[in-house]
């Protein structure tokens, strides 16, 4: 009987990508098959995220629930990876001594070896280093799971925003070689993938070396990906406004495969707070780039990230953020109350704003963002949208669902499952709070 792997993933798309590569690795090297139940597993993996507050508590709480499984089956291997593992390192075993393997985002390629050594020696294995040899050099070809795929094009971040742990947990920016990325996407396309999302913590800072020694930027990468037979839709995330270049704007205007949707985090509309965050741009500079983009690509949707209650944020600062939201007109966006991350510069800043005030501001901001996002959905009613059909509807097996260019789920009645993995034209009948309803056009 094949041995089983259970994997739980917290956090961002990069973690989802990393988890998929862990499955590929362990499937190839140890013939592990994924199971949906931790109690059936021979190996349990927890891929962690440290962006939000209480991330460590969430990790130890989950590990505590698996303690009884380990006691019942001492041969089971429990491994913890991701950004909390990178931050905590061997300290994870101080609170959860039954954990066998601790590895960081840059050492996941060593996972099969670490599991083998832990099994043989019965000794814990910990490696949260940032090796110079890229993990991508040691990964097998990616497993295909549907018509959409994530492709990591770079790792880490060198911006060192004062609130962010990424440079400390994933290291400095390292771009994958250009030809390696293209080879991976060709493999995906040959196996039925129609949409790729190019991933990086600062993806528009991509600078990949080509076979002839040149450095190619993200715009050039997008143009070459668009020329790959079978790839019909391209996304990328997450971007930094500083490196949102004219060449990228030109790519948005000229590459039809690149979706009319951009996620460009701004965090705040206050120049004072942006400076304290070390974002190195102003609200006006952010808006100027979006005006140029919208002039080149009319109708493009913009989503963003916002942090409310950053240390020292005044009511005036918050109102400047609300004004930015009005000026830009965002699609559905992500927003959070600031959470202190140990080891970051912002963790040492005085924070005198009451939590109740922060929550009140967050509610007001989210309410307005949701209004703006729903208005975009409402304006889509009566239009025909080309969607990539991805699966059966979550609520009705008699329906299929897919995504629009601006990343909205569309549910529509259809009794032809062969449409899954294909593009289809759907007439939008109505807008729901978090999805659209449509009718398939023949």
Swiss-Prot record:
Reaction(s) catalysed (UniProt annotation): N(6)-dimethylallyladenosine(37) in tRNA + (sulfur carrier)-SH + AH2 + 2 S-adenosyl-L-methionine = 2-methylsulfanyl-N(6)-dimethylallyladenosine(37) in tRNA + (sulfur carrier)-H + 5'-deoxyadenosine + L-methionine + A + S-adenosyl-L-homocysteine + 2 H(+)
Disulfide bonds: none
The enzyme's E.C. designation: 2.8.4.3
MF GO annotations: 4 iron, 4 sulfur cluster binding; metal ion binding; N6-isopentenyladenosine methylthiotransferase activity
One Gene Ontology cellular component: cytosol
Record keyword Membrane present: no
Annotated Radical SAM core domain residues: 143-375
Cofactor binding: number and manner: Binds 2 [4Fe-4S] clusters. One cluster is coordinated with 3 cysteines and an exchangeable S-adenosyl-L-methionine.
Record keywords: 4Fe-4S, Cytoplasm, Iron, Iron-sulfur, Metal-binding, S-adenosyl-L-methionine, Transferase, tRNA processing
Residues passing through the membrane, by range: none
Binding site for [4Fe-4S] cluster 2: 157, 161, 164
Cofactor or coenzyme needed: [4Fe-4S] cluster
Purpose: Catalyzes the methylthiolation of N6-(dimethylallyl)adenosine (i(6)A), leading to the formation of 2-methylthio-N6-(dimethylallyl)adenosine (ms(2)i(6)A) at position 37 in tRNAs that read codons beginning with uridine.
Family according to the record: Belongs to the methylthiotransferase family. MiaB subfamily.
Subunit composition and interactions: Monomer.
Protein name, as recorded: tRNA-2-methylthio-N(6)-dimethylallyladenosine synthase
Organism expressing this protein natively: Pseudomonas fluorescens (strain ATCC BAA-477 / NRRL B-23932 / Pf-5)
Lineage: Bacteria, Pseudomonadati, Pseudomonadota, Gammaproteobacteria, Pseudomonadales
């Amino acid at each position: 009987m094949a041995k089983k792997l259970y994997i739980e993933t917290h956090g961002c798309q990069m973690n989802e990508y990393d988890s998929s590569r862990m499955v590929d690795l362990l499937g190839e090297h140890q013939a592990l098959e994924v199971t949906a139940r931790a109690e059936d597993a021979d190996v349990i993996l927890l891929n962690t995220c440290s962006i939000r507050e209480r991330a460590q508590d969430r990790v130890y709480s989950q590990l505590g629930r698996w303690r009884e499984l380990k006691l019942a089956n001492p041969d089971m291997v429990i491994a913890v990876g991701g950004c909390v593992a990178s931050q905590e390192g061997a300290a994870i075993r101080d609170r959860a001594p039954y954990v066998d393997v601790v590895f960081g985002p840059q050492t996941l390629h060593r996972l099969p070896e670490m599991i083998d050594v832990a099994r043989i020696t019965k000794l814990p294995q910990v490696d949260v280093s940032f090796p110079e040899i890229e993990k991508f050099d040691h990964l097998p070809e990616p497993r295909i799971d549907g018509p959409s795929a994530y492709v990591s094009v770079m790792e880490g971040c060198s911006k060192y925003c004062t609130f962010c742990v990424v440079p400390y947990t994933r290291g400095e920016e390292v771009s994958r070689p250009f030809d390696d990325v293209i080879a991976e996407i060709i493999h995906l396309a040959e196996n039925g993938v129609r949409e790729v999302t190019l991933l990086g913590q600062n993806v528009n800072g991509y600078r990949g070396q080509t076979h002839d020694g040149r450095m190619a930027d993200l715009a050039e990468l997008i143009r070459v990906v668009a020329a790959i037979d079978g790839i019909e839709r391209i996304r990328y995330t997450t971007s930094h406004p500083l490196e949102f270049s004219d060449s990228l704007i030109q790519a948005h205007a000229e590459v039809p495969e690149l979706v009319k949707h951009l996620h460009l985090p701004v965090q705040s509309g206050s120049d004072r707070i942006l400076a304290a965050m070390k974002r190195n741009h102003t609200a006006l500079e952010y808006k100027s780039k979006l005006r140029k983009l919208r002039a080149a690509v009319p109708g493009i949707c913009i989503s963003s990230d916002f942090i409310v209650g950053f240390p020292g944020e005044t009511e005036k600062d918050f109102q400047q953020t609300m004004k930015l939201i009005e000026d830009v007109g965002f699609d559905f966006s992500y927003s959070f109350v600031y959470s202190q991350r140990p080891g970051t510069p912002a963790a040492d800043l005085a924070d005198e704003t009451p939590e109740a005030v922060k929550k009140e501001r967050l509610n007001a901001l989210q309410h307005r963002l949701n209004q703006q996002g729903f208005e975009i959905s409402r304006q889509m009613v009566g239009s025909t949208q080309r969607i990539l059909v991805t699966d059966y509807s979550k609520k009705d097996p008699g329906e299929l669902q897919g995504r629009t260019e601006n990343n909205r789920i569309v549910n529509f009645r259809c009794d032809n499952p062969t449409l899954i993995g294909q593009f289809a034209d759907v007439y939008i009948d109505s807008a729901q709070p978090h999805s659209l309803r449509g009718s398939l056009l023949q």
